From Swiss-Prot:
Database matches in Pfam families: Leu_Phe_trans
Lineage: Bacteria, Pseudomonadati, Pseudomonadota, Gammaproteobacteria, Aeromonadales
EC number(s) stated in the UniProt entry for this protein: 2.3.2.6
Transmembrane segments: none
Entry's Gene Ontology BP terms: protein catabolic process
Full protein name: Leucyl/phenylalanyl-tRNA--protein transferase
Species in which this protein is naturally found: Aeromonas hydrophila subsp. hydrophila (strain ATCC 7966 / DSM 30187 / BCRC 13018 / CCUG 14551 / JCM 1027 / KCTC 2358 / NCIMB 9240 / NCTC 8049)
Length: 235
């Protein structure tokens, strides 16, 4: 199949087949468009997500291979288990979405900023208000210390970003997501791409075609009705 970069129409929420994505940079498929809820949902349902540096135009990606985690197969190492047993924390869902995405967008120790621009923040906050985007929060003594956010598509959760102000906080947020999602019939977490952090948690790399086929099936299947009800999570 031929590979090319597509310029998106500003009005039509359409995307090309992800199999046309470039090999280098891996998965770059399209440029332009906007971050409207309709376009974002159309993208995620096709296995496409936006990512660009603040100085770049809006770019859309569908990498091959695709990083995924099956919730019931999350790897919890000995050190993490000890941390979970020995640390006092509270875990919640959708209690502080705005604060989580703002923390994810804040500069990191190793970089001057992140890819999460103000338009990105506004777009995902709108998806949250519409019931599509959700967050997991880790609290200690009433202070938000870690969390993650992403989109729910049926039995698939598309993870977007996470942050942590404490050791193992981001891993704890992932454990909470996987256990909660699995208990409510969730089947797959899309992590987009492999990295060293996710490798410690048991991420798998699937060929893009396998991921897209599975996404098409699972995104049409319902979760338990109360999966994303605001409240607390128990591990």
């Amino acid at each position: 199949m031929s590979r090319y970069l597509t310029q998106l129409d500003d009005e039509l929420c359409w995307f090309p087949d992800p199999e046309h994505a470039l090999e280098e940079p891996n998965g770059l498929l399209a440029i332009g468009g906007d971050l409207s809820p309709a376009r974002l949902l159309a993208a995620y349902h096709k296995g496409i997500f936006p990512w660009n540096e603040p100085h770049q135009p809006l770019l859309w990606w569908s990498p091959d291979p695709r990083g995924v985690i099956r919730p019931e197969q999350l790897h919890i190492g000995r050190t993490l288990r000890k941390f979970i047993r020995g640390t006092s924390f509270d875990i919640s869902i959708d209690r502080a979405f705005n604060e989580v995405i703002a923390a994810c967008a804040a500069p990191r120790r190793s970089a001057s900023g992140t890819w999460i621009s103000t338009p990105m923040i506004d777009a995902y906050r709108q998806l949250h208000r519409l019931g599509h985007a959700h967050s997991i929060e880790i609290w200690q003594e009433g202070q938000l210390q870690a969390g993650l956010y992403g989109l729910s598509l049926g039995r698939v959760f598309c993870g977007e970003s996470m942050f942590s102000r404490i050791d193992n906080g981001a891993k704890l947020a992932m454990v909470a997501l996987c256990q909660h999602f699995a208990r409510h019939d969730g089947a797959l977490i899309d992590c987009q791409m492999q990295n060293d952090f996710l490798a410690t948690l048991g991420i798998e790399e699937w060929p893009r075609r396998q991921f897209l086929t599975t996404l098409a099936q699972l995104s049409r299947q319902p979760l338990a009705a109360n999966c994303w009800q605001t409240g607390s999570i128990l591990l």
